[in-house]
Amino acid sequence: WDELDARIRECAACDLCKRRKRAVPGVGDRQADWLFVGEGPGAEEDERGEPFVGQAGRLLDAMLTTIDLRRGDDVFIGNAVKCRPPNNRTPETAEHAACFPYLQRQIELLQPRLIVALGRPAAQALLNQEIKIAAARGKLFAYNGIPVIVTYHPAYLLRNQPDKAKAWEDLCFARATMRRLKHGA
């Protein structure tokens, strides 16, 4: 893990490294059953080197609490792209391609039981297909045999309050899926 984190922090595989303050490898329990994957770091994450620390991070923490989870306790949080895109734009295909081996290795090391993709860019990076969140909700996908559930990114939910109820449904689906995985049902 430490070697991977160091490689991420030193990465120069795409142009995002030129503007970043800090690469953001991920944070949490390195033996977690739950992996939450976002799109990429924002301004506060770039400053602090930790994912989901701004307003969207506070919402994510609240979302975790609703299903009896806590950051760092059986939960690992990462991003599809490890450096902040300029002006918080959506990461480009080449940027995803440059970062994806890092996410792949994190998943290999972590071996989570369940992955929750937060937002369309994260879902598309993990599933390698075009995704529309509204159509993907409530369905079980897979990444290398690991179940993947798709939901809205917390930053989107901050701008689109009515969809919080849908995200709650997705989290309940994720919790029920994890219970089935743990109890073999």
What does each model-found stretch correspond to?
Residues 1-185:
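A polyanion-binding, active-site-adjacent surface
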